[in-house]
Amino acid sequence: MSTPSQRRSGRGGGPSGTPLSPTRITRLQEKEDLQELNDRLAVYIDKVRSLELENAGLRLRITESEEVVSREVSGIKAAYEAELADARKTLDSVAKERARLQLELSKVREEHKELKARNAKKEADLLAAQARLKDLEALLNSKEAALSTALGEKRNLENEVRDLRAQVAKLEGALSEAKKQLQDEMLRRVDAENRLQTLKEELEFQKNIYSEELRETKRRHETRLVEIDNGRQQEFESKLAEALQDLRRQHEDQIRHYRDELEKTYGAKLENAKQSAERNSSMAGAAHEELQQTHIRIDSLSAELSQLQKQLAAKEAKLREVEEALSREREGGRRLLAEKEREMAEMRARMQQQLDEYQELLDIKLALDMEINAYRKLLEGEEERLRLSPSPSSQRGARSSGLQHSGAGSAKKRRLEDGEGREGREGRTSFSHHARTSGRVGVEEVDLEGRFVRLRNKSNEDQALGNWQVKRQNGDDPPLTYRFPPKFTLKAGQAVTIWASGAGATHSPPSDVVWKAQSSWGSGDSLRTALINSNGEEVAMRKLVRTVIINDDDEDEEDDEVSIHHRHHHSGCSGSADPAEYNLRSRTVLCGTCGQPADKGSAAAASSASSASTVTVSRGYRSSGGGIGEGLLGRSYVLGGAGPRRQAPAPQGCSIM
C-alpha cells in the first residue's frame, strides 16, 4: 500500500519555478491538508479494520461457538461499508457544490473587476466633461470681459463724439459770430466810404460856395471900387487882396485840417477794418479747417462706431451661441452626471450584493477551516490513542493550518463558569460587521466600550456637517443622538472622533470633539451607529454584532468525542434522512433517526479496498463524564480524498432496524 507521502510526491510533480499567486498557494495548501487528513483517516480506518479482523480471528480461534458475535461484527462491517458509500455520495455532491461555488466566486470577481473598470471609465468621462465645462466657463468669462471692454470703449467713443459735436457747435457759433462781425465791418466800411464821399462832396460844395462868395465879393468890391475914389482904389485893392489872401489861407487851412482829419479817421478805420477782416478771415479759415477736420474725425469715428457696433453684434451673436452651447453642455453634463450617478448606484448595489455573497462564502470557508482543524485534532487524538505515528509532513501541515485558522478570525477565547460550578468550559467570541456608505463621509470605527465614534471623509472635497446627527442604538434600547454644530466642516481625507465625556479626551476640533452631555456612547451585543444629514436621510451606517459561543471541553483537549456521520436515505425509518453515528470508542453504530444500536448481522459486506475515503465530521462537546453529548453541532463539513472512489451498494432499508 502506498504511503501518503508517496502519493503527495506523485501529485506534486508539476513544473517547478512557476510563480503561484497567494490564492493558488492557499488553495493548494488546503487541498494538501484535505488530502493529508484523508490519507491519515484512510490509515486510521485501515488500522481499525485490521484490528477488527484481528479481534474476529482471535475470537474465532478462541471459540467457534461465538457465531452471534461474529455475525454482529459482520453486520457492523456491512453497515459501515453502506454508510461509507452514502458518505462518498454526499462527498461527491458537496464537492460539486463547492466547485460550483468556486466558479460563481470567480465569475463574481470578474464581474466586480469589470464593474470597477467601467466605473473608472465613467469617472474619467465625468472628469473630462467637468474639465470641458470649466474651459467653456473660462471662455465665457473672457468673452464677457471682452464685451465689457468693448462696451466701455463704445461709451468712451460716444462721449468723445458728444464732446466733438459740442466743439463743432461752438466753432459754428464762433464762425457765425465772425461772419456777423465781418458783415458789420463791411457795413462800417461802406458807411465810412459813403461818409468820405459825402465829405468830398461837401468839400466840393464848400469850394463852389467859397468860389461863388469870392466872385460875389469881387463883384461887390468891384462895384464898391467903382464908387470909391480913384485915390483910395489901390488901398482898397491892397486891403481886399490881403483880406482875400487871409480868407483864402484860412479856408485852405480849414480844408487841409478837414482833409487830414478825414484821412486819418478813414485810414484808421480802414486799417481797423482790414485787420478785423484779416482776423476774421484767418479765424474763419481756421474754423473752416477745424470744421473740416472735425467732419473728417466725425466720419472716422462714425465708421469706427459702426465697425464696433458690427463687432459688438458679432460678439453678442457669438456670446448667444456660446451661451446656447454652454447650456447644451450643462444639460448634457447634468444628464451624464445623473446617468453616472444612476450607474454608480447600480454598481454600488451590485458590489454590495457581491460583497455580501463573498462574505457568505468567506464565512463558509472560515467554518470549513475551523471544522478541518477540529477534525485534525480529533484524528490526532485517535491516532495517539491507537498509537499511530503521523508523518512529519502531516505534522507540519497541521501546524501551518492551525496558524492560518488562528489568524483568520477575530474571535477571543475566555473561560466561563456556569451556575452549577462546572469548570473547563471554553467560550469563543465572534464579531460581525456590516457597513454602508452612500455619501462622502462614512462611519470608520466605533468603540465597543462606548468611548468614541470616528467618522472619516473619504472624498477629495470638504463636507459641511452642520446640524448633522450621529445616532447610536443598542438593540431595542432608546437611541443616543449627537448633533454637530451649525458651522462644522470635515476637511477632505480627514477624520473626526466624537468622544464621550467619560473617556477623558481633550476637546480639540475639528479632529477631536468631546460630547459633554453624554458620559458614554453605550455598549452591548448589537450596536448600530448611523450618520444622518440635515434632511433626515441616513448617509452612512455601521452595525457591529457580538456573538459568544460557549464550548464545554474537558481538562484534556485530546479527550473530545468524535462522531462520524454517514449521510444516507432510510426508507424504513419514517422516511427520515438523518445520519447514523459511529462512535469510535465503543465501535457501535447508532441510528440517528431511531437511536437504536445497529444489528451486527443485518447487512452485507462492501468493498473496503478504496485508496481514499470520504466522510462528514461533526464534533460533539461535553461538559463532564464520558460518552457522546446530546447537543451536537448542527454543521457538517465534507472532506474529500484525491483517489478514485468506489461506490458501495445503497441499502434498500434501514440496516439498523
Swiss-Prot record:
The modification Cysteine methyl ester is found at residue 654. Residues 2-32 are annotated as: Head. Residues 242-382 are annotated as: Coil 2. Residues 395-404 have a biased composition (Polar residues). Residues 1-24, 383-442, 554-576, 601-621 are annotated as: Disordered. Residues 655-657 form a propeptide. Residues 602-621 have a biased composition (Low complexity). GO terms for molecular function: structural constituent of cytoskeleton; structural constituent of nuclear lamina. Phosphorylation plays a key role in lamin organization, subcellular localization and nuclear envelope disintegration. Phosphorylation by CDK1 at Ser-21 at the onset of mitosis drives lamin disassembly and nuclear envelope breakdown. GO terms for cellular component: intermediate filament; nuclear envelope; nuclear lamina; nuclear matrix; nucleoplasm. Keywords: Coiled coil, Intermediate filament, Lipoprotein, Methylation, Nucleus, Phosphoprotein, Prenylation. SUPFAM superfamilies: Intermediate filament protein, coiled coil region, Lamin A/C globular tail domain, Myosin rod fragments. Residues 33-69 are annotated as: Coil 1A. It comes from the Eukaryota. The keyword Phosphoprotein applies. Residues 80-217 are annotated as: Coil 1B. Residues 415-428 have a biased composition (Basic and acidic residues). Homodimer. Lamin dimers then assemble into dimeric head-to-tail polymers. Ultimately, two head-to-tail polymers assemble laterally into a protofilament with a uniformly shaped rod of 3.5 nm in diameter. Belongs to the intermediate filament family. Lamins are intermediate filament proteins that assemble into a filamentous meshwork, and which constitute the major components of the nuclear lamina, a fibrous layer on the nucleoplasmic side of the inner nuclear membrane. Lamins provide a framework for the nuclear envelope, bridging the nuclear envelope and chromatin, thereby playing an important role in nuclear assembly, chromatin organization, nuclear membrane and telomere dynamics. This is Lamin-A. The gene is LMNA.
